[in-house]
From Swiss-Prot:
Keywords for this protein: Ribonucleoprotein, Ribosomal protein
SUPFAM superfamilies per UniProt: ClpS-like, Ribosomal protein L7/12, oligomerisation (N-terminal) domain
Example of a GO MF term: structural constituent of ribosome
GO cellular component, one term: cytosolic large ribosomal subunit
Signal peptide: none
Annotated S-S bridges: none
Stated role: Forms part of the ribosomal stalk which helps the ribosome interact with GTP-bound translation factors. Is thus essential for accurate translation.
GO biological process: translation
Similarity comment: Belongs to the bacterial ribosomal protein bL12 family.
HAMAP family recorded: Ribosomal_bL12
Protein name: Large ribosomal subunit protein bL12
Subunit structure: Homodimer. Part of the ribosomal stalk of the 50S ribosomal subunit. Forms a multimeric L10(L12)X complex, where L10 forms an elongated spine to which 2 to 4 L12 dimers bind in a sequential fashion. Binds GTP-bound translation factors.
Length: 126
């Protein structure tokens, strides 16, 4: 135990440059890192935008970007998705880009997007 205390005393006498070189040499010799470990609890408790930015989006808007060559099939798909009448669905398709569905779950948004893409439309999830 006395040898450990003596070693600590000797390390305490090192300059910052020498201490940095000692840390680097120990990292190289033993294959370890002196960087502090980050625990999930500490990261979650830390205030800031990083944790919020990594949260997964839960609500999506499905936007019809372009109609494509198969306009009639896209109108049919829009009618079946939205429940709109023929005239309203045609106006929506003609006015693209338009949001077809707002604030829907990821699964529903993907289902709607697939249906529109299969009809020939260009779609974007926001």
């Amino acid at each position: 135990m006395a040898s450990i205390e003596a070693l600590v005393e000797e390390i305490g006498k090192l300059s910052l440059t020498e201490a940095s070189e000692l840390v680097k040499a120990l990292e190289d010799k033993f294959g370890v890192s002196a960087a502090p470990a980050v625990f999930a609890g500490a990261a979650a408790a830390a205030p800031g935008g990083e944790a919020e930015a990594k949260e997964e989006q839960t609500e999506f808007d499905v936007e019809l970007k372009a109609v494509g060559a198969n306009k009639i099939n896209v109108i049919k798909a829009v009618r079946s998705i939205t429940g709109l009448g023929l005239k309203e669905a045609k106006e929506m398709v003609d006015g693209a880009p338009k949001v077809v569905k707002e604030a829907v779950s990821k699964e529903e948004a993907e289902k709607v997007a697939k249906e529109l893409k299969d009809a020939g439309a260009e779609v974007e999830l926001k």
